[in-house]
Amino acid sequence: MAKVYYYGTGRRKKSVARVRLVPGEGKFSINDRSLDDYFGLETLKVIVKQPLTLTDTLTKFDVICKVIGGGFTGQAGAIRHGISRALLKADEELRPALKKAGFLTRDPRMKERKKYGLKKARRAPQFSKR
């Protein structure tokens, strides 16, 4: 028999997270590693757990996640977005709380492209009067 699970895709910067919520006791598996192994910084762990703590479902679901691309902060944001979307599939009544916290909104901020004649996106070469 197939297991019941709720699926959500989250994105942030260059990161894409495919998240599965399985009824369980609150374990996290990110790319086959635990949450503590994958994210070293405490702030990133908090970001990942935010939707579950907000909706009091931290001990109701196990989170299985595959995330690719970007850096650690982008990946944490993508996982948060994916968990929020998966929670909606589990219980549509959580929408107002998640929406108010801003977890359902895809953060549109992306890296600005480098322009020719400049060192970075906006950093100009050093100016010398003489």
UniProtKB/Swiss-Prot annotation:
GO molecular function: RNA binding; structural constituent of ribosome
Any GO CC annotation of this UniProt entry: cytosolic small ribosomal subunit
Biased amino acid composition, Basic residues: 111-130
Keywords: Ribonucleoprotein, Ribosomal protein
Alphabetized PANTHER family for the sequence: RIBOSOMAL PROTEIN S9, SMALL RIBOSOMAL SUBUNIT PROTEIN US9M
GO term, biological process aspect, one: translation
InterPro entries: Ribosomal_Su5_D2-typ_SF (IPR020568), Ribosomal_uS9 (IPR000754), Ribosomal_uS9_bac/plastid (IPR023035), Ribosomal_uS9_CS (IPR020574), Ribsml_uS5_D2-typ_fold_subgr (IPR014721)
The family this protein is said to belong to: Belongs to the universal ribosomal protein uS9 family.
Protein name: Small ribosomal subunit protein uS9
SUPFAM superfamilies: Ribosomal protein S5 domain 2-like
Region described as Disordered: 104-130
This protein's record includes keyword Transmembrane helix: no
